[in-house]
Regions:
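Extended charged/polar low-complexity repeat regions
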Residues: 1-571
């Protein structure tokens, strides 16, 4: 196989007879085998399946045979290797270091039915099936296990914390879809589909409906209408590429493409345009980008799509080097500043060295988790993990911080370097409901049906949070007294943020231009009972033709302007 970059790969295919012969030969030379492997134990042919005859041909290895960029530096081992059981089932996967990274176990009575699998350094996941071949239990020795109950048009999933989720389905012949979901806390969400099985509506646990308009031919989403009636529209070209998005506030973003379908310009909601140029008709990656200020950045790419050089708008260039496996090995910046990266035979970063020879080294466990970082001055920080790769302790400078998790992988206890503890509790939907702090304080949290925070308790303080139909926060109270208030205009932009302080209403009012950019801030202090204005201060914001902020005008003071170069760097 030759890829688009000119690399040639050899796919090594083996037959069942070849694998059987190899297994018998291996058993004869093995010191652990008291007798040779029989033909019945590893047959030369495989039985047929319900899909037809099985010729027993399997992919056993992939070799890199030619690399135009590294013609004299080809790997001496396959990039990946596969082994199989006597029934032709995938048994193990080995990476380019010949390390086994995946392992599989099968049901001897049901060929092809996987009953267990594991990743390198991780516990084994096991599966049980019913008589029809459906998974009824997934067993996780170091985390959540699941049980599955199948009924007519519904599936019940129960985890090892006894949380239950029910999936209600409709349709058939490849169009079965989940139309209703009962969550572990008893809340219910619903989904609607068209005749082709494409999602057209979702109703959340509060009964609010979001609708999706679809192109009947392509299936592209043409509009999304949220429960508050706000609509976002999407437009496409004949190649089904997104060309424009019109947002609920009326602002629009646009994208343009050339004939081969490459992105050539992108215009943001605020009107700034970035343009992309390509070296030739066959280039897939841009050679330059030019932003709204006219500043140009240049990129040079390898034949494999790797960034070789990046030149910013000031002419500052950064160069990159890679090894034959595509891993970055060096970064060269201006003024001789370089970093060199080294990897082990599994592709894991083992060291980073600068031009002065200062080196940071990295160590890993069998699962690939980063276990130690040794800095150039010899300081060593270590991290220990549980069976599933979650950090359980970190040690740095002789101080250790440790974490404990529940079966769902949620942090339930954190012990800091001073030995102080913080504990965490969660609801059935994994939301934090209580936290015991290092200082002994207890904080509690309550949520609505859609997951928004509605009440927080901090010792004697009870804060209530309120939202509008668009899920925007509108106000909050503390122990029944009004606190902050948020107000929005018809575009959904924040116009006022206010609170009461020492008996006065303190507010900040925001103004915008037609592109949604902030043009003014007005701070006021009022008598909340009479509305009398006691104090105010205004600040204006202005932008140049390229859309960059270039002037701030404080109240009753001369404007403050600044000069920029390139894409807005302060001169």
């Amino acid at each position: 196989v030759t890829d688009g970059a000119g690399r040639e790969f050899r796919l090594v295919l083996t037959t069942q007879a070849q694998r059987a012969e190899e297994a018998r030969t291996s058993s004869l030379s093995s010191s652990d085998s008291s007798r040779p492997l029989s033909a019945s134990a590893f047959p030369d042919t495989l039985p047929g399946t319900e899909y037809g005859p099985d010729r027993g041909i399997r992919l056993s290895a992939v070799w890199l045979m030619h690399d135009p960029a590294y013609p004299e530096s080809l790997p001496a081992a396959p990039l990946v290797r596969y082994t199989y059981t006597e029934a032709g089932e995938l048994l193990a996967v080995y990476d380019r270091s010949n390390t086994q990274v995946r392992a599989f176990t099968y049901d001897a009575q049901h060929p092809g039915r996987m009953v267990a699998h594991r990743y390198a350094g991780r516990p084994e996941m096991r599966y049980r099936y019913d008589d029809t071949g459906r998974v009824v239990e997934q067993l996780n020795p170091a985390g959540l296990s699941y049980r599955y109950l199948y009924e007519q048009d519904r599936i019940t999933v129960t985890d090892s914390l006894n949380r239950r989720e029910v999936l209600h389905t409709e349709g058939g012949a490849g169009l079965k879809r989940v139309v209703k979901k009962e969550l572990a806390d008893g809340s219910v969400t619903r989904s609607g589909y068209d005749a082709a099985g494409r999602l057209t509506a979702q109703t959340d646990a509060a009964g609010r409906r979001t609708e999706y308009g679809l192109n009947v031919v392509s299936g592209d989403i043409t509009d999304i209408t949220t429960p508050d009636g706000r609509e976002t529209k999407f437009y496409y070209n004949d190649g089904n590429q997104l060309t424009a998005v019109v947002y609920p506030d009326g602002l629009e973003s646009r994208r343009e493409y050339d004939e081969p379908g490459r992105l050539v310009s992108e215009t943001s909601r605020s009107g700034e345009t970035v343009r992309y140029r390509y070296d030739d008709a066959h280039s897939e990656l841009p050679a330059t980008t030019t932003d709204a200020t006219g500043s140009t950045r240049q990129m040079t790419w390898s034949r494999y799509g790797q960034l070789l050089a990046f030149t910013d708008c000031s002419g500052y260039q950064t160069r990159y080097e890679y090894d034959r496996f595509g891993q970055m090995t060096a970064v060269h910046r201006e003024e001789g500043i370089s970093l060199y990266r080294h990897y082990d035979n599994r592709g894991r970063l083992t060291s980073v060295k600068d031009a002065q020879g200062r080196e940071t080294r990295y160590e890993y466990n069998a699962a690939g988790d980063l276990t130690a970082v040794i800095t150039p001055d010899g300081n060593r920080s270590e991290t220990q993990y549980d069976a599933w790769g979650k950090a359980v302790s970190t040690t740095q400078g002789g101080l250790t911080r440790s974490m404990e998790y529940d079966a769902a992988g949620r942090v339930i206890s954190l012990t800091n370097e001073n030995g102080s503890h913080s504990d965490f509790s969660y609801d059935a939907l994994d939301r934090l409901v209580q936290q015991g702090g290092f200082d002994g304080r207890t904080q509690r949290y309550h949520y609505d049906l859609t997951g928004k925070l509605t009440q927080s308790e901090d010792e004697g303080l009870i804060t209530l949070w309120h939202y509008d139909a668009s899920d925007r926060i509108t106000h909050r109270t503390v122990n029944g007294d009004p606190a902050e208030q948020w107000q929005y205009d018809e575009h959904g932009w924040l116009t006022t943020l206010s609170h009461t302080s020492e008996g006065h209403r303190v507010s900040v009012h925001y103004g915008y231009d037609d592109k949604g950019r902030l043009t003014g801030e007005r701070q006021t202090v009022e008598n909340p009972e009479t509305g009398e204005l006691l104090w105010h201060h205004e600040t204006g914001h202005a932008y140049n033709e390229q859309g960059l902020a270039n002037r701030v005008t404080p109240d009753s003071l001369p404007p403050v302007e600044w000069l920029t170069y390139g894409s807005g760097y302060l001169a």
